[in-house]
Amino acid sequence: MISRFKFHPVGQGCFYSGEMYIHLFRRYNHFNMVYDCGASFDKEYLHQEIEHYKKRLFRSSLDVLFISHLDNDHVNGVSRLLEGIECNEIYLPYLAP
C-alpha cells in the first residue's frame, strides 16, 4: 500500500487530503479522501489549494469527504471543492432536530 496525506496551507482553518493506492489481487485500487475544507481569512489561498488538489485528483472522483464540525473555517470551501467532481460519500456530525 502506498499512501500520501497532506495538510494544505490555507491559514486559519483546515483542508486535509489523503490518497491511498492498494495493490490487491493483481489490481491497484485507488482511494481519495478529504477531511474538512475551509479557511477563516484569506480565501485566496484556500481556492488555490482546492484548484491544485482537483487537478491532481484521480478520475475526478472523491471517495469520501469528512466534515468534523460546521464552523465556517472548516466548511466554506466545500462547494468549490465539489464543483465539477463526483463525491461518493459525505460524513457530517450529528445534528439534533
Model-inferred region functions:
Residues 1-52, 60:
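Conserved beta-strand hairpin/beta-sheet module of binuclear metal-dependent hydrolase folds
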Residues 44-92:
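Active-site metal-binding motif and surrounding structural segment of the metallo-beta-lactamase
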Residues 95-97:
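Non-catalytic, alpha-helical, charged scaffold/linker segments
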